[in-house]
């Protein structure tokens, strides 16, 4: 069991106020003990003097964070899953309950379901430690077998692209470059891609 804290502090890059969550035992790895505000209001941020005050505003267990939703960091593409005989039960059930989110690939061979509402939430895991990091682990289902299993067990859909051949692909190609819109399946783009936002990054490394 890991004890977590909510900390009120500032963004070191722009000085904007923010609240972060981390394992209590990892505070000293990221924040200076002499800048903690134990009483009263949070002191102002001072970039020149490298003063970044902070204070603990709440304490919680990991179980209290389970199910909490968060905003997608780069919301250009919505998660989706393939709907076929090999799809996990949570995918087929979601597709049956939300037929308006089901779409076919351009060639009509495969069906997929957009699943944004089921992603971006906190799950629990016995693999999380406080030896390093913040005590919070980011899971990406398309980046390795371990992440894929954890996500599948927790009913978390994957985030990938679908090309003109109807093939699922990671967010970048083998050169680490974002795919061009024209290289992607039109039906997938219409269902899952914010074309205006994605266009700023298409073709970039």
Describe the role of every protein-language-model region.
Residues 1-205:
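Non-cofactor substrate-recognition interfaces
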